[in-house]
Amino acid sequence: MDYKKKENYKPETLILSYGYVPEWSEYALKPPIYQTSTFVFKSAKDGKKFFELAYGLREKEPSEQIGLIYSRLNNPNLEILEDRLTLYDEAEDCAVFSSGMSAISTTILTFLKPGDKIVYSTPLYGGTYYLFEHFLKSMDIKVLKFYLHENEDNVINLILREKPKIIYIETPTNPTLQMIDIEKFSKISKEINSILIVDNTFLGPIYQKPLKFGADIVIYSATKYICGHSDVVAGAVVGYKNYINEIKKTRTFLGTITDPINAWLLLRSLETLKIRFEKQTENAIKIAHFLKEHKNVKKVYYPLFSEGKQYEIYKKQCLGPGAMISFDINGNEETAFKFLDNLKVFKIAVSLGGTESLAEHPWSMTHSDIENSEKLKIGITESMIRLSIGIEDVQDLINDLKQALDKI
């Protein structure tokens, strides 16, 4: 198979070999780890040409290959990983980062300058909220948000009136798992020439493909499902080449690229991404149904249980409900903590998407930097628990949840 030839192969086939030729590395079946800080040029002229491209001093010629210079700019492991990360999303290009937050911050800083505007949906990940509400505001960037329970016409009018440079949405939302219509916001963004950015961490790249619905840029915390083993912190951005090229220039000077070892580990993880995520989702569906029937559970937040317009959006743009579940128990923070402390199989930890099942308390953990009044406004309560479902035996997981719920 040609290392960049896709033919009619599915992503599950391409993900094993795309972007790499064994002849490059003594016929090694898998890419080695290119643990080097710098690369040798064949000639001084090559060095000059490579830097011209790296620093955007000229456009790449059609048949020209971008050469290797220094691992802050590019590295073989990263280039192979970036090639493969385009497959599931059918993206033109990809940039990989040292964390999900570095992917978000580098992308935002690429396109916003003092005086610009950004509109974002809420709720969303607590770290992103802090970046927008504190860091961006300190740079004299106008930050506006909208709530999913707001009147739709009011939201549209806000965006059309303010004409933000960026519209940023996270769907499903973290931790309330509400759906946002990507296609609708794409139409609005194109009308005012905004950039639509979608955080697709909870469902992607298997169960939701935002580029197909008009997103310009898709962001991942690759730490989560893409890695799937809770042993790498990384981020990724996929999308159209014109946007990714600009993001890569910013990444070069901010130094937010990931390292060769993490890239190699992510290449390993990509090979099992789909089968892991399918098993996690299969488990999650059964667990969500169990929770819905338990007397000590007040409400379950899961895309499969969406109603009305929310369910319509889910059916239109999602290929499955994923493996994240949130629920409100009957009680308060003390009750929630008692439940968490009685878990045996589930681990009390933040993050998500790994092979092991995790449970956390958004009010006091992942979203603790959000004001309490704001948390209540966006649907985060003291009694909310967020679960990341792993690949364990599903009955063991259900039994664990049952015994902990029965003790509150």
PLM segments and residue spans:
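Conserved PLP-enzyme active-site core in the AAT-like
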Residues: D2-K6, S17-W24, D93-N296, Y301
